[in-house]
């Protein structure tokens, strides 16, 4: 089949790499415009664009597809002229109007990083960890105009462990998403079968995965240790949980575990011990967490042993 692929970050590039190994023809790639990145703020192509260029696939980077503007209408017409059988969309980042969704012969299929209708929206991986879900997965759906509202065609399941961060879970789901889309597109007959058997989402089970904002990554010591630990793992690698030491300095917290230490009548935010495991801090409900990797402004992330050597934190200190 002739496939258009639309995606931007590494999650999408993993799926594109898998599709490139199939017998299908990737006739075009759509991705977000190049963005400034890194310390030099150089214009940098997305991971999907880099992969497409390596395979000499034509790359399109429209700003939008709004038919109310000349450039949007031109982008729609350009896509239609490609004559695709199907379009695969993964973390593309642009809204696709109904006219675009209807253009390919079999419409547009989306690789979504959750078990829909749970966690529709921008941050399904992070929200699943922060909420304490013990399972997530991939849903392949036929796209509709609403936000992740399309009919479901295929699901795979992935346990969430107590050690998973958004970084580790992202990589597991990216691999699952790649396998899932290849299974759905094994042949034109297979695709037709999954389309015929697709399932409407139960709106009563909908939960939204709202976009992350930096401010919510500030650690709230009044929460119990289990919730603090979930948040630390959910916000790794972005925006990274932090302790606001003073107006200008934030201590980033990359990793943690539930502490085996305890102290009677400890104040929330109080450091009760510093040892080879890490920095043990009192949380709400008389629970305790152990910070195992932290990073001071301008420095590198430190492990438990290195934290103790800095002597920048001390037992009895109350973290804000």
Swiss-Prot record:
Classification via CDD domains: FMT_core_Met-tRNA-FMT_N (cd08646), Met_tRNA_FMT_C (cd08704)
MF annotations from Gene Ontology: methionyl-tRNA formyltransferase activity
A Gene Ontology cellular-component term: cytosol
Enzyme class: transferase
Keyword field: Protein biosynthesis, Transferase
Residues that, per the record, bind (6S)-5,6,7,8-tetrahydrofolate: 114-117
Known catalytic reactions: L-methionyl-tRNA(fMet) + (6R)-10-formyltetrahydrofolate = N-formyl-L-methionyl-tRNA(fMet) + (6S)-5,6,7,8-tetrahydrofolate + H(+)
Family: Belongs to the Fmt family.
HAMAP family: Formyl_trans
Name assigned to this protein: Methionyl-tRNA formyltransferase
